[in-house]
Regions:
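Accessory nucleic-acid engagement/destabilization modules that flank
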Residues: 1-156
Length: 156
């Protein structure tokens, strides 16, 4: 995956890695100078993922930061390849609410990945929006027309 992402690792190696080393790899592979907001977002993403993925450290799985969708130039914050599924994660660091535009953004990324990445055509892609200051979450899912999954909004 040359130049398609800024960082790629197995879950096990990512979870054992010092967060500053992961951040350093992101900076080293980034073309240009990362803004302070980008740097803070990456730090937040690394912290969250190293915490929540810990129970999965023995899984044969990969984590990819800043994956560029072929032919479109869009970058997905994080892609997780786990148990035959592709998780497309879009972080909104410091944000409390899941805005409709953000939901549409992560759904578009998942659809773009399915349409423009040949190894994803026949895979289930799970788009996940993560507003990091949101107080609740939902575990309710429903299949969408394209065979992907879409989060059903919770009423609580």
């Amino acid at each position: 995956m040359p130049n398609r992402c800024l960082y790629i690792s197995s879950f096990k190696d990512f979870l054992a890695e010092n967060p500053l080393a992961v951040l350093g790899a992101l900076h080293n592979n980034y073309h240009g100078e990362a803004l302070t907001t980008t740097d803070e977002a990456w730090k937040g993403e690394i912290d969250i993922l190293q915490r929540v993925l810990q129970p999965l450290k023995e899984e044969v799985a990969q984590i990819i930061f800043e994956y560029e969708i072929p032919r479109l130039g869009k970058r997905i914050d994080v892609v997780l390849l786990l148990r035959g599924l592709i998780f497309c994660l879009e972080f909104k660091v410091g944000q409390k609410d899941a805005l409709q535009a953000d939901v549409e953004q992560v759904m578009d990324y998942a659809l773009d990945l399915k349409n423009f990445h040949r190894f994803s055509h026949d895979k289930v892609i799970v788009p996940v929006l993560i507003p990091t200051r949101h107080k609740s979450s939902t575990k309710e899912f429903k299949p969408s027309v394209s065979g992907n999954f879409q989060v059903r909004r919770s009423l609580s």
